[in-house]
């Protein structure tokens, strides 16, 4: 039997990354706590439970749950829809590419070693995360076209933040697949996903 609670949490993680990308592209900034939650998820590779990936508490996925609920209600921004569905598609490509998976694992291991020297949200670490996305994930499929302010999107720091958040989105997409998530559920069990997302969201308050 599918654990829709965990499937929804992982999918909320994907949607949260999509929302952060939108914020960065249109405003050049994102909610700091939510941004850190995304980055931190890259360092949690052996969680005891799914909440551990997102700071141990469901409240850290509040923005992602809000976004997911809007998306499942067909009230969401079309760009956000494209972002999170593209992340799921890229995860599908990654799962079928053993070499890319191994390289990604090795690069994430080296990333974790760097936090001895640098803060996770430092410009150096963001650059490393962005390079991992560009080197391994981006070549797997169609590149995600990000829409926003050209002035912001030209800034290297904003570019690196966006790619780092996209990498975190891939982390959540991998988790979603591991929890039993499928695209068929999004098509045929939308009401079940929506009801579960609303139930989890209501528990935050």
From Swiss-Prot:
It is found in: Cytoplasm; Cell inner membrane. Pfam families: DUF489 (PF04356). It is a peripheral membrane protein. GO terms for cellular component: cytoplasm; plasma membrane. Keywords: Cell inner membrane, Cell membrane, Cytoplasm, Membrane. It comes from the Bacteria. Belongs to the HflD family. This is High frequency lysogenization protein HflD homolog. It comes from Haemophilus influenzae (strain PittGG). The gene is hflD.
């Amino acid at each position: 039997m599918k654990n829709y609670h965990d499937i929804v949490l992982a999918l909320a993680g994907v949607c949260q990354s999509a929302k952060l990308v939108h914020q960065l592209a249109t405003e050049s900034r994102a909610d700091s706590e939510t941004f850190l939650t995304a980055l931190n998820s890259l360092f949690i590779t052996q969680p005891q439970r799914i909440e551990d990936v997102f700071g141990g508490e469901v409240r850290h996925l509040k923005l992602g749950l809000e976004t997911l609920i809007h998306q499942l209600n067909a009230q969401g921004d079309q760009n956000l829809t494209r972002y999170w569905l593209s992340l799921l598609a890229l995860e599908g490509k990654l799962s079928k590419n053993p070499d890319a998976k191994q390289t990604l694992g090795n690069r994430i291991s080296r990333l974790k070693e760097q936090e001895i020297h640098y803060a996770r949200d430092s410009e150096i670490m963001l650059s490393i995360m962005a390079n991992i996305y560009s080197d391994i994930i981006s070549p797997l499929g169609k590149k995600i076209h990000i829409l926003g302010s050209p002035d912001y999107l030209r800034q290297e720091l904003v570019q690196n933040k966006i790619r780092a958040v996209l990498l975190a989105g891939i982390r959540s997409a991998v988790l979603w697949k591991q929890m039993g998530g499928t695209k068929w559920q999004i098509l045929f069990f939308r009401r079940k996903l929506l009801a579960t997302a609303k139930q989890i969201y209501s528990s935050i308050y």
